[in-house]
Amino acid sequence: MEYDWTTSGYDATVAQGVTPEEVHHVLVHSKARIRRYEDDHLRIIGRAYTGRLIEIWLREESSDHWLVVIAFEAGLAGQLVFRRLFRE
């Protein structure tokens, strides 16, 4: 997956205490739950190398290129869905 950051997305993610390295790991190296929630948006939940479960919202910029809108530590609902799907 090719992705870039929006300026506001990078700032919002860092403000949530999530590092760009954690986001990269989830998007490139982690098993993840991917859900399209609008025609041009994705919601991804995956485990970062730090062990934290990270939720990432992306907006499609062009075919197969995405912009990170925000990333944050997954809440209880995200954790339950991820555990059910991946039996963690």
Where are these regions (language model features)?
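Ribonuclease/tRNase effector modules and their secretory precursors
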Residues: 1-88
